[in-house]
Amino acid sequence: MSNQVRVAVIGTGSLGKEHARIYADLAKAGLAQFTGVFDANPEAARTHAARWGVRAFASVAEAAEASDALSVVTPTVTHHAIARELLILGRHVLVEKPMTDNSEQAQDLVRLAKENGLVLQVGHVERFNPVFSYLEQAAPFPKFIECHRLSPFPARSTDIGVVLDLMIHDLDVVMAFVKSPVVSVDAVGIPVLSRSEDIANARLRFANGCVANLTASRISPERMRKIRVFSGGDHPVYISLDYRVQEGFLYRLARDGEEESSLLRKLLAAKESTIVSEFAGKRIVREPVPINKDEPLKLELSDFVACVRERQTPKVSGAQAKAALDVAFEIVRQIQSSP
């Protein structure tokens, strides 16, 4: 393989076209070679190929022949067959979430990638959100986590329920963040507009004692992607973060004498920091968090290309994605088996 990775996109729907856009940008920057796109609808493939000046492939095999690494951005039910074909052909794969629609298929992809020494990355894009990067270093001892992921009913992903469509993002984030086995799951959900669950709530307990409460809805009148974390240790903090706008606040105890410091007085005067509670001589300070905003999907695809080039393990490996998927399947099982 040359130093410039040849990349292609399988599927040019609402998300696939974004993969194509970013690969085109990487190609302009000399970081990859964008070879082309394939879609089950040949006209769609030709339209997107013409837009980016690349090839419209006639088949997955033809796309693989011209490429080193490919994004699979197709309906979930097709993920396993397409990714499997590519891995057998010796190609590196980024498959969008959810990885597959059952655990056995996910394990099959993990096995094939390992046996062939290939990169298998799964598109859990929130792991590349600068919000998550900040959270990892700011809250090292999570004790309680609350996630809300709400959206109006989509025109896509109607082949799966809200757990595999939306909640899977938060399952992956929380499990990667807590770094401890899930020991219990308690879930509830209901279908409203579709045959699958459209609203779901799950409570996870981890071996280290951390508890996470996750809520997902795809029938909300507004969009929300937020995470709130209570972290313990010698310096307990509460952090509230918004994935969409990449902003948030940190709440912490003021250190002795800090309220008299010139820096805090300046922040308080500018209303960038606020004293929100006082008791027994202690004060809780709220302050905005420093986040370097960026496009998560761009960071994700750049990382995929770099992992292929350097033969490194991706941040979201197939094995990690399967672990989150298995918890998602347990949540769905509980929802479907409840009266």
Task: Tell what function each PLM region has.
Residues 54, 89-91, 116-119, 210:
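A short helix->loop->beta-strand "cap" motif at the edges of active sites that frequently abuts
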Residues 35, 68, 143:
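Conserved acidic residues
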Residues 192, 211-299:
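NAD(P)-dinucleotide binding in Rossmann-like oxidoreductases
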Residues 1, 69-72, 289-291, 299-339:
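C-terminal helix-rich "cap/oligomerization" subdomain common to oxidoreductases
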Residues 154-222, 226-230, 243, 319:
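Rossmann-like dinucleotide-binding domain that binds NAD(P)(H)
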Residues 100-157:
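A contiguous active-site-proximal alpha/beta segment in oxidoreductase catalytic domains
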Residues 1-52, 174:
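N-terminal Rossmann-like dinucleotide-binding module
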